[in-house]
């Protein structure tokens, strides 16, 4: 049993507690929360200078792309970034697995306890079986030709079932509105079952996506036409959010939202990956339109980020928004847990096992702050 205290305890369930104390058992479960350290004999308390918050939730990652780290120092837009991703198979399996392991170790060190991870392969399977982190595996499906929709869903089902057969959470999800035909979207909806809590979809990452659906023209349309894509992709959709009706789903996490505006917003969760946004498009979302109650944060992959650190992502959001410190921590912890359906994470509450992070050096901003995993 441990009694852990700090200058401030950010429960993210109630107001911050000055000199609050967490009572935690050997399994990391919160047994009690004390509002004042005087309630506990001082010799039993581990006191830290700084603030304590729950473990971070990385709501969007591509762990299987970790081997593409430092492939390029910069790219000029989304199309150039896709060229990097296309090289993913030019590496040995051993090299890929080592990079995946190193990336997970980095996330653990940086206080991340759970991840929404995009999967196109089973490269991460062996690592995830060890359950050092809690993963929601989104089996990504995409196909722009109607006649290949059944082939695409069959491949996704094979991968999903491998994860599920190893007791790992897995849901087939569309990559994006522009890369999935209406036929494939219908098939994805049809294979969804009661264990699928949410979908995760790349959304409005570039302005060209908006032009495609609104004006039925632009670089995306030209590219799609050049590869003989089904015109139903843009003709049948008035916006990226048209997929909500096609999926007939309960929940969606829309990822990136770099070119999302206030009128676009639906009652869903939105995940921002600011470091990756700057790397790929050199642009950030307009954070003023997003409520701090349904915005979560991800690192994206090491192909588009120098590190997997939620505190660094939050610092960048802080520099470009008016969110308070408590709101930023909710974005980094509570909201991601809610978006992914991870009920044991995200807040300090009795009965939960959320992990405990110590944050120091945050007096003026998160830019110079550091995180240390305590539990």
What does each model-found stretch correspond to?
Residues 2-3, 8-53, 172:
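Histidine-rich, glycine-flanked metal-binding segment
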Residues 23, 51-52, 69-132, 154-165:
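Alpha-helical scaffold segments that flank or form the walls of functional sites
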Residues 55-59, 115-116, 135-139, 170-174, ...:
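Hydrophobic faces of well-ordered beta-strands that scaffold small-molecule active sites
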Residues 62, 120, 140-144, 175-177, ...:
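Active-site beta-loop-alpha junctions enriched in small/polar residues
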Residues 66-98, 136-142, 206-251:
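Active-site gating loops and adjacent loop-to-helix segments of metal-dependent hydrolytic enzymes
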Residues 116, 173-189, 278-281:
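Active-site glycine- and acidic-residue-rich loops that bind
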Residues 222, 246, 274, 285-361:
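His/Asp/Glu-enriched, well-ordered alpha-helical/loop segment
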């Amino acid at each position: 049993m441990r009694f852990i205290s700090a200058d401030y305890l950010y429960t993210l369930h109630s107001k911050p507690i000055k000199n609050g104390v967490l009572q935690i058992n050997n399994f990391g479960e919160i047994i009690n929360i004390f509002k004042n350290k005087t309630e506990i004999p001082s010799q039993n308390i581990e006191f830290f200078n700084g603030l304590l918050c729950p473990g971070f939730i990385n709501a969007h990652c591509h762990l299987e792309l970790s081997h593409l780290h430092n492939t390029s120092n910069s790219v000029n837009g989304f199309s150039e970034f896709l060229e990097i991703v296309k090289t993913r198979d030019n590496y040995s399996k051993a090299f890929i697995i080592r990079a995946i392991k190193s990336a997970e170790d980095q996330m653990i060190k940086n206080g991340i306890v759970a991840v929404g991870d995009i999967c196109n392969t089973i490269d991460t399977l062996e690592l995830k079986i060890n359950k050092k982190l809690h993963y929601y595996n989104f089996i990504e499906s995409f196909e722009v030709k109607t006649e290949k929709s059944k082939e695409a869903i069959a491949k996704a089902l094979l991968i999903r079932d491998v994860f599920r057969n190893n007791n790992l959470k897995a849901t087939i999800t569309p990559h994006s509105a522009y890369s999935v035909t209406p036929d494939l979207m219908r098939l994805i909806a049809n294979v969804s079952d009661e264990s699928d809590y949410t979908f995760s979809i790349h959304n409005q990452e570039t302005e060209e996506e908006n032009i495609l659906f609104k004006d039925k023209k632009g670089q995306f349309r030209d590219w799609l036409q050049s590869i003989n894509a089904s015109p139903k992709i843009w003709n049948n959709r008035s916006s990226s959010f048209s997929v909500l009706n096609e999926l007939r789903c309960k929940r969606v996490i829309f990822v990136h939202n770099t070119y999302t505006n206030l009128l676009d917003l639906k009652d869903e969760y939105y995940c921002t990956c600011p470091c990756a946004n700057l790397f790929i498009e050199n642009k950030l979302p307009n954070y003023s339109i997003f409520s701090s109650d349904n915005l979560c944060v991800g690192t994206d992959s090491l192909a588009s980020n120098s590190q997997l650190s939620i505190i660094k992502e939050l610092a960048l959001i802080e520099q470009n928004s008016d969110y308070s410190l408590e709101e930023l921590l909710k974005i980094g912890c509570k909201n991601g847990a809610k978006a992914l359906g991870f009920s044991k994470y995200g807040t300090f509450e009795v009965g939960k096992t959320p992990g405990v992070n110590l944050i120091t050096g945050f007096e003026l901003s998160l830019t110079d702050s550091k995180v240390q995993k305590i539990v």
